[in-house]
Amino acid sequence: SRYLYEAGGKRIRPVLTLLAAQLGDGNTEQVIDVAKALEITHLGSLYHDDVMDGADRRRGVPAAHAVWGNNIAILTGDILFSRASQLMSRLGERAIRLQADTFERLVLGQMHETLGAQPGDDPIEFYLQVLADKTGSLIAAATQGGVIFSNAPSEYEEPLRVYGEKIGVAFQLLDDVIDLSAKPCLLYTSDAADDSLRV
């Protein structure tokens, strides 16, 4: 389960948790547990995403499913989700609810991306909501968790949650643009972006 962790990554979620905690008591043991749990959740989601997307590589190394097969990659993601839940459960009901609500949004975002926009959906609104759920929700939880578990003033919680979600949407939007830019021939066909982004 350390394969993708050791491959690198930006660690933006734990960094934002630790930064948000500076509004309160700083990097307490609880804050550090939240930072760990949310990064572990993110790692678990990468194992699953790569299976679903059929990705060949992740963080410069072969994707886990390309090395060990789909079953092991999925089970590795599952064990990481369980370990993240164990960490959050030590922090009480508020942490459990934060993890559960975040995980629900993450899964719904992935599900909606897989299904694609339905007739009657505004494709841009649909796409942005997918980004907010799939990527923004976990970064929002990171900033929100930093506020909650550092005992920062409660008035910071919602603005920091919104801030984290917007960072997540912007990051995923940029990532999608980079993916499209790697295939310049796709950019000049009328429906290429829609097909690539499933909207």
Residue ranges: model-predicted function:
Residues 2-37, 126-167:
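Alpha-helical phosphate/pyrophosphate-handling elements in metalloenzyme active cores
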Residues 164-182:
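Oxyanion-binding "anion nests"
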Residues 81-84, 103-104:
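Hydrophobic, amphipathic alpha-helical faces that serve as interaction scaffolds
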Residues 188-195:
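Conserved small/polar residues in nucleotide/adenosyl-binding loops
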Residues 27, 86-98, 114-126, 144-160, ...:
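Inter-helical turn/loop segments and adjacent helix faces that build the functional surface
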Residues 5, 12, 28-77, 107-111, ...:
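Aspartate-rich (DDxxD/NDxxD/DxxxD) Mg2+/diphosphate-binding motifs
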